[in-house]
């Protein structure tokens, strides 16, 4: 008995290119984007390939991901937690690690029942005092964790460059 082997990188005319190849590649509980409602690539043109869903370019907020920034004067983390209430979130600092945990029990939504849980850890930069870290939750579900960076002590000083007449590297003696 022959078994057909389907390679995900080979385009097949009767198989939509954008379909998830594994169960975990699907976006459960997330809203549809407008591009999800377009016809499949093979019905448009045999030469047109719509990019797969993981290559879409929505804003970071729509993806459920986090963004960590290290700016001149502060360290910050923005994390999309729109599916969690403030009571379902915990932010802790353990040594030089920030831990964010969110969990809600099973509840019913328009698609059925769903429960969610996540753990995220971020290393605090060496120039940020863990005791100064704060967090806030915006009305649109973005958790912001930030802390000020320590300023370098002392004024800036320009160091003059002197020129020497001898080379820095000397040739090795030949044998």
UniProtKB/Swiss-Prot annotation:
Protein name in the entry: Alpha-crystallin B chain
UniProt GO molecular function: metal ion binding; protein homodimerization activity; structural constituent of eye lens; unfolded protein binding
Record: glycosylation sites: 41, 170
Gene name tied to this protein: CRYAB
Sequence similarity: Belongs to the small heat shock protein (HSP20) family.
Residue numbers binding Zn(2+) 1: 83, 111, 119
Residues annotated as domain sHSP: 56-164
Cited Gene3D superfamilies: 2.60.40.790
Signal peptide: none
Segments passing through the bilayer: none
Residues that bind Zn(2+) 2: 104, 106
Keyword DNA-binding in annotation: no
Pfam hit, one: HSP20
Entry's localization field: Cytoplasm; Nucleus; Secreted; Lysosome
Keyword Transcription regulation in annotation: no
Disulfide-bonded cysteines: none
UniProt source species: Macaca fascicularis
CDD domains, per the entry: ACD_alphaB-crystallin_HspB5
Chain spans, region Disordered: 142-175
Domain of life: Eukaryota
N-acetylmethionine PTM sites in chain numbering: 1
Annotated keywords: Acetylation, Chaperone, Cytoplasm, Eye lens protein, Glycoprotein, Lysosome, Metal-binding, Methylation, Nucleus, Phosphoprotein, Secreted, Zinc
In-chain residues carrying the UniProt-annotated modification N6-acetyllysine: 92, 166
Task performed by this protein: May contribute to the transparency and refractive index of the lens. Has chaperone-like activity, preventing aggregation of various proteins under a wide range of stress conditions. In lens epithelial cells, stabilizes the ATP6V1A protein, preventing its degradation by the proteasome.
